[in-house]
UniProtKB/Swiss-Prot annotation:
MF GO annotations: rRNA binding; structural constituent of ribosome
Gene3D superfamilies in UniProt: Ribosomal protein L6, alpha-beta domain
Pfam families found in the cross-reference section: Ribosomal_L6
Gene source species: Stutzerimonas stutzeri (strain A1501)
Protein name, entry field: Large ribosomal subunit protein uL6
Biological role stated in the UniProt entry: This protein binds to the 23S rRNA, and is important in its secondary structure. It is located near the subunit interface in the base of the L7/L12 stalk, and near the tRNA binding site of the peptidyltransferase center.
Lineage: Bacteria, Pseudomonadati, Pseudomonadota, Gammaproteobacteria, Pseudomonadales
Gene Ontology BP term (one): cytoplasmic translation
Length: 177
């Protein structure tokens, strides 16, 4: 059995799990998420925890059980606590402003960049140079953060651009004459 799949997923209070066929749905205080479970993975609910096992013992099935366990664990954390990703804008005149489901960015281009946030993700701007992306789906929150960062990646000479708050930008020295 996969070492990841051996650990059960503990269900905190207020989180509901419903299994219908291969469809697993998780409901919590912050929202609801669904996952199509691979047919070779067996999901067993025992009391306040979920266990995952492969229907047969081959390598691929064990790997799929571990992957499913990790995805369901992220779903449980998402609907109970939520996920967030912080971005920083570094550069003169770089600004961000959240207006509903649209994030307006001034990133040194001749035009403002308007990013439409997908359903289930919200953005806050505590200051003009900080962006806080929140949601229940870990993959979607990370994807949105990566797409916003791709508008203007941090460049290695001055470090200007959009970066994750915990990112360390490798700097280069300018060419010498």
């Amino acid at each position: 059995m996969s070492r990841v799949a051996k650990n059960p997923v503990k269900l905190p209070a207020g989180v509901e799990i419903k299994m219908s066929g291969q469809q697993l749905s998780v409901k919590g205080a912050k929202g609801a998420l669904e996952l199509n479970v691979h047919p070779s993975v067996e999901v067993i609910q025992e009391g306040g925890e979920l266990r995952f096992a492969g229907r047969n013992g081959d390598q691929q099935t064990r790997a799929m059980a571990g992957t499913t366990r990790a995805l369901v664990n992220n779903m449980v954390i998402g609907v109970s606590q939520g996920f967030e990703r912080k971005l920083q804008l570094v550069g003169v005149g770089y600004k961000a402003q959240a207006k509903g489901q649209v994030l307006s960015l001034a990133l040194g281009f001749s035009h403002p960049v308007d990013y439409e946030l997908p359903q289930g993700v919200t953005a806050e701007t505590p200051s003009q140079t900080d962006i806080l992306i929140k949601g229940v789906d870990k993959q979607l929150v990370g994807q949105v953060a990566a797409e916003i960062r791709d508008f203007r990646r941090p460049e290695p000479y001055k470090g200007k651009g959009v970066r994750y708050s915990d990112e360390v930008v490798r700097r280069k020295e300018a060419k010498k004459k």
